[in-house]
Regions:
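Alpha-helical cap/lid subdomain in secreted, periplasmic
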Residues: 1-119
């Protein structure tokens, strides 16, 4: 998963950002439960964030930690992509990651999977 970047803007602009962050974390944890239910107990899930923004990364880590404690499901991991540069080759359309940045992200993910996930 790599979700939460666009949610950061919604959270920051909400009337009560702290409550909205808590709600995001709760909904993220519920989403993990649904993913597990739909994909079975053997599926490994990587909860990533980046490379544009990390505003909700701590909330994602907290959601994963709470989920793991609650369910004893140790096949859920967190990963933080390297932050992209705000100018130059990293930037594509509408300030989203360019093709070359996405290729770098794919390399990061493969390295993470080999080191942390694949047994």
């Amino acid at each position: 998963l790599n979700i939460g970047t666009n949610d950061a803007t919604f959270v920051m602009l909400s009337e009560e950002p702290e409550k909205t962050e808590q709600l995001f974390e709760e909904k993220y944890r519920n989403f993990l439960k649904l993913l597990r239910q739909l994909n079975g107990s053997e599926t490994k899930i990587v909860c990533a964030l980046g490379s544009i923004d990390y505003y909700l990364y701590d909330r994602i880590c907290s959601a994963v930690e709470k989920y793991r404690k609650e369910t004893q499901d140790l096949k859920v991991y967190t990963m933080k992509y390297t932050k992209m540069l705000s100018m130059g080759l990293d930037v594509g359309s509408c300030f989203h990651p360019s093709k070359s940045r996405q290729e770098k992200m794919a390399e990061e993910l493969v390295k993470f999977l080999k080191k942390q996930v694949i047994e």
